[in-house]
Regions:
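Patatin-like phospholipase
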Residues: 1-159
């Protein structure tokens, strides 16, 4: 598949999955908030191994889009393990608390659903996003401002 860049004010922008989504590091270095909430739309793992050509192509797409993010999360996990709390940069990484909003609904969608711009599909995504955020807040919201609710080591285990 091939998509053209979107031009805004004379500058070309590519889909993040092809060039890397915005990095997390500026949130550590340039933001006073210690909590970062990752809204994950592509599953890291699947319950079932894809067997059809379309399911395999969809999974390849998910892996490709997740690769830059997973690499950065791996770097963050490593930096947090070795951070020198006496060093300014080390303190920034050590204080970072990662959280993740995810949805089983999104895990059931295939690649073709990403091309669906019909109003019903968009409102279903919005509604599922609200539901996922509400679930996150009910189950893990009490961690905000206190501790990470996303275990980076467990997420990256076996990657």
């Amino acid at each position: 598949q091939m998509f053209q860049a979107v031009e805004i004010d004379g500058k070309a922008y590519w889909d993040g999955g092809f060039s890397g989504n915005p990095t997390i590091s500026p949130l550590v270095r340039e933001c006073s908030a210690n909590d970062t909430i990752l809204v994950q739309i592509n599953p890291v793992k699947r319950r079932r191994t894809p067997t059809t050509a379309s399911a395999i192509a969809s999974r390849v797409n998910e892996i490709s889009f997740n690769a830059p993010l997973l690499k950065e999360l791996q770097m963050i996990a490593l930096l947090q393990q070795v951070a020198d709390l006496g060093h300014c940069e080390g303190q920034l990484w050590a204080r970072m608390r990662m959280h993740r909003i995810e949805s089983d609904y999104l895990n059931e969608l295939d690649y073709a659903s990403k091309m669906n711009a019909e109003w019903a599909a968009l409102t279903a995504l919005r509604d599922e996003g609200i539901k996922a955020a509400d679930t996150f807040l009910a189950e893990k919201g009490h961690h905000l401002g206190k501790r990470a609710s996303l275990d980076l080591s467990a997420l990256l285990e076996g990657m």
